[in-house]
Regions:
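N-terminal topogenic module of multi-pass integral membrane proteins
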Residues: 1-51
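Membrane-interface transmembrane-helix boundary segments in multi-pass integral membrane proteins
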Residues: 12-29, 175, 193-234
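Short juxtamembrane and helix-loop transition motifs at transmembrane-helix boundaries
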Residues: 13-18, 44-53, 68-83, 101-111, ...
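Structural signature of hydrophobic alpha-helical transmembrane segments
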Residues: 24-28, 80-92, 114-115
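Alpha-helical transmembrane segments in multipass membrane proteins, preferentially the mid-helix core
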Residues: 34-40, 98-99, 151-170
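Cytoplasmic-side transmembrane-helix entry/capping segments in multi-pass membrane proteins
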Residues: 52-56, 87, 111-119
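Aromatic-anchored segments of alpha-helical transmembrane domains
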Residues: 62-71, 118-130, 179-188
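Membrane-proximal helix-loop-helix units in multi-pass membrane proteins
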Residues: 102-160
Length: 251
């Protein structure tokens, strides 16, 4: 039994996960299916007497997914957790936390932040989940990662379809300010801890990812990342802009 837990909660020494394989596509397709079901049943969910319990359950699942990442590190010293890599400084982690509180309180302010964070930062984790290189479908980390990242999208679309939340231009600025605070914290930690690379501002990831196209020069790297975030924010808001424009034309 000890050997099983050591294996399940640990990680391999050779590649166990490859991009754009069934192990990559399956969780994303399942997320899309769940979101589609929420859309189809949005009226029934809104009127259900169990709606609040459902939101609380999803909020609880989000928090457990995030916390279990650190519980695994504490329980598996062989993973060599350290302040260089494992401090809670990241867009994805805080998106999950904010989504959890958003679900409990039906918070529009938190929705404003996480909507743009999901479609400008966490989206890259779905496209190139390089942190799973040594943890395939037979490892706990594989399921923890996918639940943590897909439940955030499910939570946001739940609030859109069931509770009618939507982003605005003001939401984008609010989210950008919160993102800037996170970036400043990550930059400070990267300068204080040798080898730290939070938000991948210091250097590219060790494993191949979309960030490999960025230059090693810090100033140029951060400038390109900032420009990319502006573009991603604009693309995330574009469907709502077009929807509003169409409504104005119909009046």
């Amino acid at each position: 039994m000890k050997e099983f837990f050591t294996y399940f909660f640990g990680q391999g020494t050779t590649q166990e996960f490859a991009l754009f394989t069934p192990a990559h596509f399956a969780p994303v397709l399942l997320m899309i299916l769940v979101i589609w079901c929420i859309y189809r049943k949005r009226d029934a969910l809104r009127e259900s007497r169990h709606e609040e319990k459902l939101r609380y359950a999803l909020a609880f699942a989000l928090i457990i997914c995030d916390m279990s990442y650190y519980w695994r590190l504490v329980g598996m010293p062989s993973l060599n957790p350290s302040a260089v890599e494992n401090l809670p400084i990241g867009i994805c982690a805080w998106t999950v936390i904010f989504c959890s509180f958003m679900m409990v309180g039906k918070s529009q302010s938190l929705f404003d932040i996480v909507y743009f964070w999901l479609f400008s930062g966490s989206l890259f984790a779905l496209i190139t989940p390089t942190v799973l290189t040594y943890t395939g479908p037979t490892r706990y980390r594989y399921y923890q990662f996918w639940l943590e990242h897909t439940l955030g999208y499910i939570a946001v679309f739940y609030m859109i379809f069931v509770h009618g939340m939507r982003p605005t231009i003001r939401s984008a600025f609010k989210s950008a300010i919160a993102m800037t605070v996170m970036v400043l914290i990550a930059y400070w930690v990267n300068t204080m801890i040798p080898g730290a690379n939070y938000l991948y501002m210091a250097r590219p990831e060790a494993a191949p990812s979309v960030l490999d196209i960025l230059p090693p020069n810090f100033a140029l790297r951060v400038s390109i990342m900032a420009f990319a975030m502006v573009v991603m924010y604009a693309l995330a808001y574009l469907p709502w802009y077009r929807l509003d424009k169409k409504k104005r034309q119909l009046k």
